[in-house]
Amino acid sequence: MVPVLKKYKAAAVNAEPGWFDLQESVRRTIHWIDEAGKAGCKLIAFPELWIPGYPYWAWKVNYQESLPLLKKYRENSLPSDSDEMRRIREAAKANKIWVSLGYSELDLASLYTTQIMISPAGDVINHRRKIKATHVERLVFGDGTGDTTESVMDTEIGRIGHLNCWENMNPFLKAYAASLGEQVHIAAWPLYPGKETLKYPDPYTNVAEANADLVTPAYAIETGSFTLAPWQTITAEGIKLNTPPGKELEDPNIYNGNGRIFGPDGQNLVPHPDKDFQGLLFVDIDLDEIHLTKSLADFGGHYMRPDLIRLLVDTNRKDLVVHEDRVNGGVAYTRTIDRVGLSAPLDASATEAQSESV
């Protein structure tokens, strides 16, 4: 698809989520969508696990301390086929805006680190899950499967992609995105401590500065794409909500001020936000600015040697239980996006919801 709109305004969220509170999380999501719409944006990008906030407490507590927090976190995670999701999709439609949303997806009895792309019509055109939860995140989240791997999609505002956290550092996922001609990327980040918290032998890659100012611009350079990096922030009240009784309360400022937006050549395009900034970072995107960057190094095209190096990608769903297709033979698969109820157009979803309420 040739982009219909090559020049437009986009926004990256740099704000605090509604910790452990699904309804407050949805309220804040709609608020920022509305704000981006009022500002004339065609795209808004939310951080990783924006709903109901990143479980950063998992890095701070032992097993027993984690249990009350984990229970509350699960109770406030977002089912994809829900009234809350419909309200978010309706907000996207009302503002005629593309929305990249990161959330803790409750699917049956498991949680997944999920991103969706909502179109200006309120339809979900991409549903993906983080392919591998990072370190202690594996105590909370499962892994994505083949058909939740796709990250890049053709839209009227260009080939847009999104990945979660350290997926933006994964060379294989970057190579796959480059092969699809990605033009605008959303590097969605969670809540991250600053370098002042670093203690040997914890690697420098595990602090905010490394990911905001090294990993993210590297993604922009290697893929030749505009790269928006939305980040979560936290206040003193948020620290209290994420800290078990008896634990010392941290200074929230060590976690804040990390939102970034980079051009396709890796240049920083917006001032770094202040530690107390809660809001949107804006950028004017011009897809034609990508031409010269990719003319020098297009790793998905002229600057690669597929006769020497190739990447095998399996986008087939892997099910615990499969059913025989007795009509056509073989095995019948249901796409994840269909099974979780996100593939139906918004208008159809609304009609179905009204029928159920009668």
Swiss-Prot record:
Catalysis: reaction(s): formamide = hydrogen cyanide + H2O
Keyword Lyase: yes
Catalytic residue list: E48, K130, C165
Domain CN hydrolase residues, every copy: 8-287
Induction: By cyanide.
Enzyme class, spelled out: lyase
Disulfide bonds: none
Biological process, per Gene Ontology: cyanide catabolic process
Alphabetized Pfam families for the sequence: CN_hydrolase
Gene Ontology MF: a single term: nitrilase activity
Its EC number(s): 4.2.1.66
Top-rank taxon, per record: Eukaryota
The UniProt record lists the keyword Lyase: yes
Gene3D superfamilies tied to this protein: Carbon-nitrogen hydrolase
Alphabetic keyword roster: Hydrolase, Lyase
Function: Catalyzes the hydration of cyanide to formamide. Degradation of cyanide may be important for plant pathogenic fungi in infection of cyanogenic plants.
Subunit structure: Oligomer of dimers, forming left-handed helical fibers.
Family to which the UniProt record says this protein belongs: Belongs to the carbon-nitrogen hydrolase superfamily. Nitrilase family.
UniProt name for this protein: Cyanide hydratase
Organism the protein comes from: Penicillium rubens (strain ATCC 28089 / DSM 1075 / NRRL 1951 / Wisconsin 54-1255)
